[in-house]
Amino acid sequence: LSTASTREGWWSGALSSRDTDKYGYQGKYYPLHSRIEIRAKIPYIYGIWMGPWCRHYAGASVAELDIEEFFVKEFENTASPRRLSQALHLHDNKTGNLGINVNGYGRHTVLDFDPGADFHTYGVQVDPDPVSPDKHAIISYLLDGKVTNTFKTIDYDDRYNTFITKAIAEGREKRTWDIAITGQIGGKNENGIGYPEDRNANLRNVSMDVDWVRVFTRDETEPEIPEKPEYPVEKFDYSRAVVEKRVFDSKMYWYPI
């Protein structure tokens, strides 16, 4: 899959799992407690704002999980100009409004590579908090399988848990997250984006290449690992029907859905 922004053709575009309802199918949503990952090659260019994110079924005003964003303008003149932003926006029960960037400055990760040069895996995982699984969650962001930052709703009492309690009360635990992939050219300067012509007046085509999007849920059943074939040795991968290999703890395994 390749989503491309062409200046003469259009300025922005998006793919959304919930939009399957426009083609004769039920809108597609994914479980509240799940791990969502995307492997993609995403351009790091001034004025280009592309990225995958998750929206709560009741709207982004309840919860938005930004799996990847690049704000090139914001960091271009800093000591670490190349950074990944993985922001968390959750309804704030104290103010009655959407809480922006509730995971604070820790949402930024310094990159030592060009994300537009090769594929990397960006992800978010939402786990029930074992202390209070019906009211609270632990949200972890990931880059290439490693956790970049973690947010625990219980640390703020019941201030940021509407996305959990609402889904459970309305029976939507299995159908909570809409997965969207946005391609966009330009954004407000105050948002740290700017416009590409401010740096490159000749920029015309920008592509974000997506290898895959995968969603996993947990199960305590230990998987049966298939025998590794003699050939091809280097290209061998576990079947999607078996299990995603990473393990969260000793007795919980991620299974693809």
Annotate each language-model stretch with its function:
Residues 238-257:
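Extracellular/luminal Pro/Thr/Ser-rich low-complexity repeat and linker "mucin-like" segments
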Residues 1-238:
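GH16 jelly-roll
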